Every structure is written in C-alpha cells, then in structure tokens.
UniProtKB/Swiss-Prot annotation:
Keywords: Coiled coil, Ion channel, Ion transport, Membrane, Transmembrane, Transmembrane helix, Transport. Residues 357-410 form a coiled coil. The keyword Acyltransferase does not apply. This is Aluminum-activated malate transporter 6. Belongs to the aromatic acid exporter (TC 2.A.85) family. It holds the Pfam family ALMT. Malate transporter.
Length: 538
C-alpha cells in the first residue's frame, strides 16, 4: 500500500501541474487578445480568407481541370495575408511580380526547349541553374532588399512551370492556372484585409511616434526629480548595464524611444503602400517625416540617457549642493517635459503649434540655470585646492625664473673658463659636450621629478583621497546641469522637424478656447429659444 499510494500521489501531482500549466497558457492567450483586440480580429480575418479561398476547391463544375491547382490559392492566402493592410499589399505586389516574370520567362524557355527536341532537358536544367544563380546573387544587393520575397516567388514559379510542364507536356496550363489561383488568393486577402476591420500600418506609425514623446518626457521628468531627491541605486541592475529590457520606469522610457528605430522603418515601408484612409487623405502622405521627427526625439533621448547615467554613477554630488540649484534644475526639467508632451499631443491630434513661441519658457529656464551656475561656480570646484594650487604655481614659476638666471650665469662662467683652458690645451675639446649635457640635465631636473605620495594608510593619504572624491562629486553636479542645458538646445531641432511635418501633412490649426466657448454659448442660447417656442405652442 505504501509504494502504490506514493505512486498514485505523484501521478496526481503531475496531473495537477499539467492542468495548471495549461490554464496559465490559456490565460496568457486571453490576456494577449485582451491587451489588443486587433489581434483577435486579425485571426478571424485570416480564417475567413482561408475559408473563402477553399470554396474554390469544391467548384468542380466550372473549373473541372483546374481544381488540382487550387492549392496555390490557399498557399497565397497563408503567405500574403499579413497583420496590416500595407504589409499585405507589399507581399501581394512582390508575389505578383515574381509570378508574372517567372511565368513569362518559363513559357519562353519552354517553347525554346520544345523546338530543340533532343536537348530539351539539357536546356531546362541549364536555365534553372542560371535563374537560381542570377536571382540569388541579385537579391543580395542592398537596393533589392524590399523585393527579396519576389525573388523567392520567381525561383519557385520558374522551376515549377518548367519541371511540371515538362512532365505533363502542357507548359501553358501550368503557368496559367497557377497565376489564376494566385490572383484569386491575393484578391481575397486584399478584400478581407481592407474592408473588414482594417489594420493600418500608417496609423501604428503615427501612434508610435506620438508615444515616443510621452516616454522621453516621463523619463526626463523622473530623472530630474530623482536626482533632486537624491535617489541612489544600491546596485545597478545588470539588465541596465547590458542595455536589456528592464522594469525601471526611468530607463524603459527613453529606451523604448531609442529602440523603436527598426519598428518605425518597417512600418514606414508598409505605410507608403497604403491608400488614403481616415485623417491621411492623400496618396503622398509624408510618412518619412514621421520617422524624421522620431529621429529628432531620439536625439533628445540620448541626452536623457546621459542624465540617467548621472543617477547611476558611483560618484554623486552632495545633497546640499543639489539643493542650491534645485529650483533651476526642477524648472528646466518640467519645462522640457512640458514641451515634449505638447508636441506629442499636437502630433497625435495632427494640429499645428499655437501662435506663441513654444521654446520661450524652457530657454528662459535654461538661461536662469546658466546664470545660477555662473554665480555659484565655487560650489562646483574645490576653492581651497584651487587657491593653494594657484599660489604654488606662482611660487614655482618664481623659483624657476631665479634658477634659470643662475644657470645662465654659471654657463657664462663655464664658457669663459673653457675658452681660456682651450687656449692653453686645445686637446681638451671633448669635455664641452659633457658640460652641456650636465647643464641640460640640471634644467630638466624639476620637470622629471614626480610628487611621491604613498597610498599605504595614513591621515594624509585619506585626506587627499577625500578631496579628490569631493572634487569629482562637484563635477558630477556640473555634468548633470550641462546635460540639461544641452537637452534644451536640442529641442530647437525637434521643433523644426515638427513644423516641417505639419506643413507637408497639412495639419489643421488649433481652435482657440474662446471660440469654443462662444460656439458653446451660442448653441445653448439657440436650444433655449427652440424650447421656448415648443412650449409656447403647446
């Protein structure tokens, strides 16, 4: 009973663990769809497109001879149907180019091989080799990267038409029905993807760029507040040190903006193909300017990344020194985040900037910070060591001048002595070079000496190390302030990129608040007047 009971218990535990694992996976799948409902609609549309295309298989009466080729329609749906409309259009275009070009070329080569009779298979094999070599080599060119799928379809269609046509003896039917069912599958994908809950890549690109503004603004504001509150990391997370995904809100904010480059490029390639829809009313909507604007945001995010590095640094400024610049640092951070959020809101609403200058407040705050640094620059350096170093340098300069004067006098005396001795003994000319060498070593003696400081304990060493770290901590505060000023300077490029986008995309002008109030009041008065007329008649 004991071993049997133990085995039953282990079997029951394993079944419970398996059921828990299945439940967790189902829960994760439900959360995946709940976080973005478009994923559910995409899956439904994919199944619908496959079902519609599969109907062709059962239509044996009108297409009795072609039913065996209907699988190409299903394969086209599986391969071409993508998440967004733009991606589907790109895949469909590449498949059409590859199919048409390969089908036409294969029919021409098939006709040539039939005329050659005895060399038919030799010509087919040679042409397949050449097509594979040329297509594979050409798609490696950087300019051909967007058409890589077209090259794959070209090779597949070219080989199938030649090989299967040679076996059946009917090249034209193979090429024709393959092209026909590919058109049916691609058309099904486009109709379902465009007219049934469409998912637009351009809209995703628009939202991604707008969210980058908010992410960088949150990181900037959080970094400034954390620095002024003397927030320190006991141990910097390894994920931050290796630039991986982390839960730190200060880190994840600017990292998401920096890491969005590849996603923006792929969305841009798809958005260019999409027809006008929603607020994007033109075929030549400036999608590239959205990516350019996001690049300007990343340029600012790099500065925020360096500002966050000041918080992660091991050498930190003293809290009392931070409080001396608290008001100015806080204002620059708040005004900079305010500008980012305002531009991000304008991008999201597709509105122009207001009549006022958007950078006035943040630039004024940066100027006040710069003036505060100038007035209290003594807090950013070790004034005692600066004064002591200056006095020491002046004393050394005075001693060096006096020493050079003595050396010159001794040189003149030595020269007179040598000249007189040379007149008495001409063979003693070799001693002159030794005298010059000893004199040169005498002049360089001060430059060759190095202050000998022992780091093996002692109060003097501790005091020296303390002063070094104190000076470095003050420089940390200066670095933080200078990075904030640099961030403000980069905002001008960001505003210029937004104005270029708003001009090309024809953003609408913002509606003044007083106009909205007047319209609301007028509408209210008209409603009251209508109510009075209604009740007066009744």
């Amino acid at each position: 009973m004991g071993p049997f009971h133990q085995q039953s218990r282990e079997r029951l535990l394993s079944q419970n663990e398996y059921s828990d694992m299945c439940f967790r996976k189902i829960t994760n799948l439900c959360e995946l769809g709940h976080s973005d409902r478009r994923r559910i609609f995409f899956a439904v549309k994919m199944g619908m497109a496959l079902a519609l295309c599969s109907v062709v298989i059962f239509l044996k009466e009108p297409l009795h001879d072609a039913s065996k080729y209907s699988v190409w329609g299903i394969l086209t749906v599986v391969v071409v149907f993508e998440y967004s409309v733009g991606a589907t259009l790109v895949k469909g275009f590449n498949r059409a180019i590859g199919t048409v070009s390969a089908g036409g070329l294969a029919l021409g080569i098939a006709r040539l091989s039939v005329l050659s009779r005895d060399f038919e298979q030799t010509i087919i094999i040679t042409c397949i080799f050449l097509a594979g070599f040329i297509a594979s080599y050409s798609k490696l060119h950087p300019a051909m990267k967007p058409y890589e799928y077209a090259f794959r379809v070209f090779l597949l269609t070219f080989c199938i038409v030649l090989v299967s046509g040679n076996n059946t003896g009917d090249f034209f039917s193979t090429a024709y029905y393959r092209f026909l069912f590919i058109v049916v599958g691609a058309t099904t994908c486009l109709v379902v993807n465009i007219f049934i809950f469409p998912i637009w890549a351009g809209e995703d690109l628009h939202k991604l760029v707008a969210n980058n503004f908010k992410s960088v603004a949150n990181s900037l504001e959080g970094c400034v507040n954390g620095y002024l509150q003397c927030v320190e990391y006991e141990r910097v997370p390894s994920k931050i040190l290796t630039y991986q995904t982390s839960d730190d809100p200060l880190y994840s904010g600017y990292r998401s903006a920096i890491q969005s480059t590849n996603q923006e490029e792929s969305l841009l390639d798809f958005a260019i193909w999409e027809p006008p829809h929603g607020p994007y009313r033109t075929f030549n909507h400036p999608w590239k300017n959205y990516v350019k604007l996001s690049g300007a945001v990343r340029h600012c995010a790099f500065t925020v990344m360096a500002i966050h590095g000041c918080i992660l640094s091991e050498i930190q400024a003293a809290p009392e020194k931070r409080q001396a610049f608290r008001h100015e640092l806080q204002r620059v951070g708040n005004e900079g985040a305010k500008v980012l959020r305002l531009i991000g809101e304008k991008v999201e609403k597709m509105e122009n900037l207001g009549p006022g200058e958007i950078l006035n407040d943040v630039q004024r705050a940066a100027e006040e910070l710069q003036m505060k640094i100038d007035s209290k620059s003594y807090l950013l350096v070790n004034s005692e060591s600066w004064a002591a170093t200056k006095e020491k340098a002046e004393a050394e300069e005075y001693e060096e001048e006096a020493h050079e004067t003595k050396v010159i006098k001794s040189l003149s005396q030595i020269w007179d002595t040598n000249s007189s001795s040379n007149n008495q003994n001409p063979a003693s000319g070799n001693d002159e070079s030794q005298i010059w060498e000893s004199t040169e070593s005498m002049m360089l003696r001060n430059r060759e000496t190095w202050p000998s400081v022992s780091f093996i304990g002692g109060s003097v060493v501790n005091e020296t190390v303390y002063k070094v770290y104190e000076s470095a901590s003050s420089l940390s505060l200066a670095t933080f302030a200078s990075l904030l000023i640099e961030f403000v300077a980069r905002l001008e490029n960001l505003v210029n990129a937004f104005e270029e986008l708003s001009t090309k995309a024809d953003f609408r002008d913002p509606v003044p608040l007083n106009v909205v109030d007047q319209e609301g009041l007028w509408t209210t008065l008209m409603r009251l007047r209508r109510l009075r007329r209604y009740f007066g008649r009744s």
